[in-house]
Amino acid sequence: MFSLDFCLAKKQSIKREDCFDRCFPPAHGTILDEKLVSHHPSCYNSLERESGKFGGKQMKQSFRWRYFFQQVLLILSACALFLLNARSISTVKVLPLSALALFFWTKYDHRLIEWRPRFWAWNLFFILSALGICLAPMSIFLSAFADSKIIVVLQNLSGIEANLLVRVICAILVAAAMWFAFCAVRYFYALLLPVATDIAADFHAIELWTLAGVSAILMIAVAVLYLHTNAFAHPWLECDLLYSSDSGACIKYLSYFRIGGVENDIRSPLFALFTAPFLSIPYLLSLLLPVANAQAMVLTMAQVPIHVLTWYLFIKMIPNCSINQRLSLLVLALASYSGFLFAFFPEQYIIAVFWVALFLYRLIQHNRREDFLVVGAAGTMITSAAFAFITERQDEKPRLGSTIKTILLTGLKGVGALFAFGCLDVLLSYQHVAHLFTYTNVSGSFMQKLMQYSAHVSSTLFAANAGPIVMTSEINEWKDIALGSMVWHEYPVTVISIAGVIIFSLALIGFLLNRKQILSKASLFWVIFSFAVICLFGWGTSENGMFLYTKYFGWAFFILLVLLVQKVLTWLHLEKYAAPVYLAAGVGLFLYNLPQIKALLDFALTYYPA
């Protein structure tokens, strides 16, 4: 998707056989395969010089016209999918721009059209994923366009009843969109699989089985909880029911799949693009379950392995840790209030932090700065674009011009994805940006923001100071929580959190003692960034919603604290006791947080039974 070097291989010195292997697996034909030749110009050029069987320019022109036809077919299918995901009729205005961008994208990277998996079973997976992506926006499309002016005009021309007409149009668009959705999912995994394969090679079988077991336990817990309460993703109380989470809106408005979803604004411009391939099949499964909140339950269950793996990727980057120590640290991370509770929330931050973890792991462990992962992190949460300034480790200090060029190219690829994959609705929702500034508090009291920040830092490990309150005013954005509704919110912060100050101070000490490690530098960078976002810009302070950001920023504090403990144990020559120390800390932390967890669950079961 973002490796233009691959597409311009003819400018590189590569062997014909290497080019073939990178374009297509060996199972897909001989060296004279027409698909191979049309896929990559350099393959054709090298073969043309060595064989007289091609018929010269005529054959080359034939391949080019064939590929052009495939481009046009893909663009038409893409337009159908973009219309299905449209926020409004005005989306039609930007379709030509998306079509043009997609044309140039496929011109320079043929994999979107012609990449093939090694095993046929992958195609079934891609088809089911594409089906889920195309079916997900149907309900919103039907309700949004039933009374639109275009439908009225078409109804007058055809004489068909409006609801039936909308359903027919929707069915046609779904069928037409399947090809692009299939190619896009296939392309997504073509980019992700090499990264995933390299990362999986670093894992021991014990680690993989443990991650699977922990995920299974938490998924069962999610299923049991959602069968008894709908508080974690309420069907009509869309936001701020538990803390300041918009979990209900994420489910109701299909933020995981709809490119033009209401939650996928400038904050998360490419969120659906980097999430739908993971959750589209679980969405299909949810349609088969005879449970009222099946969609929320299944999608939350599907997020659990991502949540667990994200934590373990951060832990695995910590140097000089044995398997037992890493697994003990996983227990500690999931025993924290944030780590445990976010396993039960369908939240965008879970996906956003996953892409951050992938990027940092690839960079730190493999010294590979993948633009695909940078755009994934920034596209799912725009503030993660700050990681674009991190470059690969080099023997010589990189030149400033080279660094700037790398950053600009990454940004250009992100903007290209925004245009080519139908996410221009983000730009059309500029009026919503003004509303987002209501969540900031730049001119507010710095001391008040500092107190809230200290509470935020404390909540990364310990239970937030929260409880049931009665809503006394409507929510500005959604206006869906009625006056008098019981919600679970953080109490106003009136003092500096001592626990937050201690955690912040220990994190700084952890950095100072490990300042040469790139993981330590990245973690400190994120800690400083969190301070700037909350204390300077005041993001989230106006609604006192600090707990929600513990998932996004909490991992940096966790890593720095572990690095500090690791250093202290080394000084005391107690490294062999690290695993029991982490495990005991995890058990103690969970027991400390248990009363608050129990109180929250009692609230959910009492006021919002399923």
Where is each model-derived feature located?
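Membrane-interface alpha helices of multi-pass inner-membrane proteins
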Residues: 82-83, 368-397, 402-410, 584-585
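Hydrophobic, aromatic-rich transmembrane alpha-helices
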Residues: 103-106, 191-193, 312-315, 473-517
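Membrane-lumen/periplasm interface segments of specific transmembrane helices
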Residues: 219-230, 405-499
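Short hydrophobic/aromatic helix or loop-helix immediately within or flanking a transmembrane segment
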Residues: 261-297
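Transmembrane-helix motifs of polytopic, lipid-linked glycan transferases
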Residues: 301-321, 509
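Transmembrane-helix signature of polytopic, membrane-embedded enzymes
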Residues: 314-335, 521
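Short acidic/glycine- and proline-prone juxtamembrane loop motifs at membrane-interface regions
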Residues: 344-350
